[in-house]
Structures are given as structure tokens and as C-alpha cells.
Amino acid sequence: MKGKFIVIEGIDGCGKTTQIDEISRWLPTSGLMGKNSKLIKTREPGGSLLGKKLRNLILDNNKNNKPSSLAELLLYSADRAEHVSKIISPALKKEDWVISDRFSDSTLAYQGYGRHINLEIIKNIESIVCQGEYPDLTIFLEISAEESILRRKNFVPDRMESEGINFLQKVNEGFKLIAKEKKWKVISATQNITAISNEIKETLLKTFRN
């Protein structure tokens, strides 16, 4: 019996990190996990040791280091291949639970809908790098591109966060299309933090309670 794999998706500023921290505190006491199961909290890019180095390279805001769209796609894919091999698959095989800030559908949204790379090319690459590991549940925290920018106005942006509102709107629309196609749980991230957390917890209980 494998563990469970949960992914939180959404554009920057939607509150993924805050909610993952809250859910990570709650899940081990929820009664959902096995007695000997551990909870692994991770992220993309940067979930593995190699991934941390790739993250610095991918998100470097130095314009002289900006990769081409195809190179960017392949860097994210390399990060994911290592992430699955070294972190996700081993944890699930041990019946541990994994909660990740982003997974493969972020690549479809950002590099596919945002960068206009052919979606079938991305899907073919992802079918290799994911190695058969796909989320048991994906939750999409939805906010507008305008709200995302407003929330991040006092932070120093990385390269992806510096792309501007037009790019972000395309990515967000991509996420909405993917969410509809794959029947994700969509939660409005304009609510207060507690309301969002409660909705996520209810979703987890409905999905995984025996």
C-alpha cells in the first residue's frame, strides 16, 4: 500500500506556502495517515539537493542568465525527474504522505499556456519524468493576476515573478483550464487564511477518510 500524494497549485501570491505549513501541522493529528506514516513537505523547483541548485539557476533574475523557453522547460523537467526519483517515489513506497508546493501541472500552466510551448511536447516529457507518480489530490488556490501582484508588491521578485501581468494572466487561465479538465478541488484564495485552511481540511477528510 502506497502513501498519498497531495499537490497545492496556483499562481504566486495565492498562499500555497501558508496553507501547506498549516496542513502539515494538522495532517499527522487528523487520523488520516497510517500509524507509522510520516509527512514529507516538499516543493518544486527545489525539492531535492540537485533541485535546490536548479532552482537558483531557473529563478535567477539576472537578465544575462535568462534561459530560452525550451531550456527553461527542460530545467524544470530535470528538477522534477530528480524530485520524483529521490523524494516522492521513495516516500510513497514507505507509505509516507507527500504534500508538494507545485508539481507537473505548473509546467503546463507556466511553460505551456504562459510560454506557448506545445502542450503535447510538455505532456510527453512529463510522462517520462513523472515516472508514473501523479497526485492523489490536487488543490488549486485561485486568485486573480491583479491580486497576485498586489500581494507581492513589497517582496523582491524572482525571474518568474517578474514576468508581468499579461504573462501571469495567461498562466492563470491555463491553471483554470487544467483544473476543469482534471477535476481539481478549486478554492477561492481571497478568503481569510482560516477559512481556506478549513476548506482544505474538509476536502482532505472527504477524499481520504476510510
UniProtKB/Swiss-Prot annotation:
Broadest EC class assigned to this enzyme: transferase
GO cellular component terms given for this protein: cytosol
Binding site for ATP: G10, I11, D12, G13, C14, G15, K16, T17
Top-level lineage group: Bacteria
Catalytic activity: dTMP + ATP = dTDP + ADP
Protein name, per record: Thymidylate kinase
Molecular function, one GO term: dTMP kinase activity
One Pfam family matching this protein: Thymidylate_kin
PROSITE patterns in the record: THYMIDYLATE_KINASE
GO biological process, one term: dTTP biosynthetic process
EC number: 2.7.4.9
Function according to Swiss-Prot or TrEMBL: Phosphorylation of dTMP to form dTDP in both de novo and salvage pathways of dTTP synthesis.
Keywords per UniProt: ATP-binding, Kinase, Nucleotide biosynthesis, Nucleotide-binding, Transferase
Family the UniProt entry places it in: Belongs to the thymidylate kinase family.
HAMAP family named in the record: Thymidylate_kinase
Cysteine-cysteine disulfides: none
Species: Prochlorococcus marinus (strain MIT 9515)
Keyword Transferase listed: yes
SUPFAM superfamilies: P-loop containing nucleoside triphosphate hydrolases
